[in-house]
């Protein structure tokens, strides 16, 4: 005798916050769902995941041959930004200011702000701006970025526990941007940063989390379990300090692992280098979205097209 299967949708009386990035008629909204990722059998998804294209203030230095080919003919940051915005499947442009790193090129804040303005003037799509990853420099740099982008409703990535007062207050209060809150793959650290940011006076619905990332195969299980726990607490326990949507910068992780960086001369049996980089980027982004990311940031046009 066959037993009938009656599916009962899992309904939560809670939602992930819907956060809109961008201004005018060029906006994207991330979050807003009341179900686990891709559980469309429980409820319709309010906003499908979004994809950003990463570009750097360093131009095309150090990028793969396939990426260079896509940007052929682009000589200025404005040119690069326009091509990124036009990429098939792109929802927004993410500018990373890696040249500001004091342990690297150490560009001045004025130089970096000039790049931010050039990119902002070149494209009208939603903008995400990432700092240089140095907490002291970002504490000075990102408030100036927030000031330069007034009126754009941009996402500023990211404040951390060490510099949230400077960045959170500037981006979230003084200049009315969206605050990216970055923690290191730990639900308690993610929640604590959201709590202290809202205590500054920043609206919880103007915060997007970057809970940390890794390339697939590189301690990646921690990323999955952390996202899983965050979504579980946000929806199952209606924890409003974990209901911020999640954005994950994927490309910075995946293009730096040996599978993507080893040359074909060194590793002929691994196949074409560009394809390996795309594979790492696609599989990591797909896993991030399945685990709970509401947006991912990618670099290669093939990756963007595939994930979209």
Predicted regions: what is each one?
Residues 84-88, 114-122, 143-150, 167-175, ...:
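Acidic (Asp/Glu)-rich catalytic clusters
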Residues 62-69, 89-118, 123, 129-136, ...:
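Glycine-rich, proline-tolerant flexible connector loops at the mouths of alpha/beta enzymes
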Residues 50-83, 104-107, 131-135, 157-159, ...:
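Active-site mouth loops of central-metabolism enzymes
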Residues 94-96, 105, 126-137, 151-164, ...:
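Catalytic beta/alpha-barrel core
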Residues 1-71:
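N-terminal amphipathic alpha-helix/helix-capping segment at the start of soluble metabolic enzymes
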Residues 53-58, 93-100, 212, 249-252:
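Short loop/turn segments at strand-loop or loop-helix junctions that form parts
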Residues 47-51, 89-91, 123-127, 150-154, ...:
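Short, well-ordered coil/turn segments that N-cap beta-strands
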Residues 162-307:
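Catalytic alpha/beta core domains of metabolic enzymes, predominantly
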């Amino acid at each position: 005798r066959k037993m009938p299967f009656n599916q009962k949708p899992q309904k939560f009386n809670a939602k992930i916050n819907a956060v809109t990035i961008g201004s005018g008629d060029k906006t994207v909204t991330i979050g807003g769902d009341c179900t686990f990722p891709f559980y469309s059998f429980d409820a319709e998804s309010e906003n499908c995941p979004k994809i950003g294209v990463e570009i750097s203030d360093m131009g095309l230095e150090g990028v793969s041959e396939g990426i260079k080919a896509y940007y052929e003919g682009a000589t200025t940051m404005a040119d690069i930004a326009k091509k990124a915005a036009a990429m098939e499947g792109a929802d927004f442009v993410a500018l990373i200011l890696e040249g500001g790193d004091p342990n690297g090129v150490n560009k001045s804040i004025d130089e970096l702000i000039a790049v931010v303005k050039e990119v902002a003037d070149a494209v009208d799509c939603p903008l995400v701006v990432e700092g240089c990853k140095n907490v002291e420099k970002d504490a000075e740099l990102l408030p100036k970025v927030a000031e330069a982008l007034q009126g754009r409703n941009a996402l500023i990535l990211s404040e951390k526990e060490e510099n949230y007062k400077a960045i959170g207050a500037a981006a979230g209060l003084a200049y009315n941007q969206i605050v990216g809150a970055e923690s290191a793959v730990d639900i308690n650290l993610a929640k604590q940063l959201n709590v202290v940011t809202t205590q500054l006076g920043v609206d919880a619905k103007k915060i997007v989390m970057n809970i940390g990332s890794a390339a697939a195969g590189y301690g990646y299980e921690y990323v999955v379990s952390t996202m899983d726990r965050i979504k579980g607490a946000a929806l199952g326990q209606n924890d409003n300090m974990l209901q911020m949507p999640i954005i994950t910068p994927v490309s910075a992780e995946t293009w730096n692992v040996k599978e993507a960086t080893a040359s074909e001369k060194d590793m002929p049996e691994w196949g074409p280098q560009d394809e390996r980089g795309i594979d790492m980027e696609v599989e990591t982004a797909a896993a991030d979205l399945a685990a709970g990311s509401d947006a991912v940031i990618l670099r290669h046009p093939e990756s963007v097209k595939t994930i979209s």
